[in-house]
Amino acid sequence: INTDDDEYWPGLTVDEKYFYFTRQIGNEEFYYSTKIDDSTWSPSRNLGPPINTHLNEGTISVSSDGQYIFFTACNRPDGLGSCDIYFSKLNGSVWGTPKNLRAPVNSAAWESLPSLSFDGKQIYFSSNRPGGFGGKDIWVTTFEDNK
């Protein structure tokens, strides 16, 4: 999994079969590896489009069932601020088109570092939006049922 490049922000599915992380090669991009046996992982693979783009993707969080990813993406045309949090649903073996979480998670400020609760009902993230205590603060949003 490790290379001469920077790898960070690891995340596992609850069954420990899929390992997601960020690799920085110029811009940040998302990679994954699958578990072969108790001590071996497959070579890492780039998640590719539509998740990774020519822009900057930052940090990734995977739902416990492995069906959703939440991630930071910066400077996208549908963004509300410089960096926003997006999600994508796994359709079979292909990740769907990413969707911006919009307000109340995203704002005109910077949002990043998503971390999804185990039950998938809350997302914790960092933002420098107005109303916090300092430069960057930790925020939480509770998702409504079926949204």
PLM feature spans:
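Short, conserved micro-motifs composed of acidic
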Residues: 1-147
